[in-house]
């Protein structure tokens, strides 16, 4: 499943390739949108929504999440509003930061996610090291974000350079 406008060679036999940009009506829904639509696993609604808003896309099933996860999601106008102003948005940022960690920690996160619910991610316990790591990375991120805000702008562009162990320029 893909959503980037690229030419892809004909797949091998028994390999199915779907790219919404190569359809009759090209569209750029994120992979998580299509995975959720194809799998149809209602228990993964929260995870699909996290993937979509993390990609800057507000899916049509966001209204359903409002009913099922009312304590984590509310009616929003944009994906970015959902990302920065809801608890599911916070979960999305936790997952995003977790993917930028060491490989061993990413593997632990994936094992944890196989049995986790949305609420498990926000719960502090020894099984969920993701939240602890998120808090550590988020503290550094917030300092860099504040530094970037105070840095000079030229029109709509912001030129900001930082160094260190984190690779979070897309988030900034």
Enumerate the predicted regions with their spans.
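Long, charge-rich alpha-helical interaction segments
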Residues: 78-133
């Amino acid at each position: 499943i893909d959503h980037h406008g690229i030419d892809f060679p004909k797949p091998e036999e028994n390999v199915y390739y779907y790219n919404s940009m190569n359809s009759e009506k090209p569209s750029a829904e994120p992979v998580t949108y299509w995975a959720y639509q194809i799998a149809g696993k209602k228990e993964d609604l929260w995870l699909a929504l996290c993937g979509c808003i993390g990609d800057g896309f507000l899916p049509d099933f966001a209204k359903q999440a409002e009913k099922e996860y009312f304590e984590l999601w509310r009616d929003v106008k944009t994906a970015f509003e959902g990302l920065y102003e809801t608890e599911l948005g916070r979960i999305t940022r936790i997952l995003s930061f977790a993917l930028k960690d060491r490989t061993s920690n990413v593997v632990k996160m994936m094992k944890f996610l196989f049995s986790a619910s949305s609420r498990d991610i926000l719960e502090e316990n020894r099984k969920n090291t993701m939240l602890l790591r998120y808090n550590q990375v988020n503290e550094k991120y917030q300092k860099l974000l504040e530094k970037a805000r105070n840095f000079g702008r030229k029109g709509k562009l912001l030129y900001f350079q930082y160094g260190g162990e984190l690779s979070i320029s897309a988030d900034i």
